[in-house]
């Protein structure tokens, strides 16, 4: 088992920063690890016209923020396209006309290549656990197909308790293990932050790997240090090495 999947309780909860934290933490344990974002959407800059005109081109430009963060998080020499199968301008290509261009065979090949090259691959989803991946499959369906264990990124905000418990429940009902969850503080002004963490810890059987505070430009910082559950990280490292 060389791969695991990072899902989130919603969009915008910090899946990529949590993935960065896991990559950095496992690298400190001498694990050769890379991130993989199968489908990225919503670029920072407009795509070029010639890219839009080419129906075979899955890239408007190689500037999706999430993919770039994953690329910069690993110590391995990987290109943008090594760790991303599709980048789209549209924010939700899975439910637009673009969905017909997403071929899971390509995603599977890209994942297999990474898994054959590196010790561990951290696969980051898009949107939430049950979000569509293409015309036929959800991300959950695809993860079940590959029998990947799951880590849940929880953006700590109003409503996150319900979102987190539903996500964990769905993952477990589909027969996959939850290796742990990460609390990512996305609202510095949220009241009862500590109480929310306590409730989640009491309701989620999987261990809390760590709490990432609200910090400026986390994509440029060592966020792996916030994953303080080293015992569970060692367990994950051992499990993935089998």
From Swiss-Prot:
Catalytic activity: (7R,8S)-7,8-diammoniononanoate + CO2 + ATP = (4R,5S)-dethiobiotin + ADP + phosphate + 3 H(+)
Pathway noted in the entry: Cofactor biosynthesis; biotin biosynthesis; biotin from 7,8-diaminononanoate: step 1/2
Subcellular location field: Cytoplasm
Cofactor: Mg(2+)
Key word Magnesium present: yes
Cellular component terms per the entry's GO annotation: cytosol
Keyword annotations: ATP-binding, Biotin biosynthesis, Cytoplasm, Ligase, Magnesium, Metal-binding, Nucleotide-binding
Residues the entry annotates as binding substrate: 41
Annotated residues for binding of ATP: 12-17, 66, 184-185, 213-215
HAMAP family reported in the protein's UniProt record: BioD
Protein name: ATP-dependent dethiobiotin synthetase BioD
Record lineage: Bacteria, Pseudomonadati, Pseudomonadota, Gammaproteobacteria, Pasteurellales
Gene: bioD
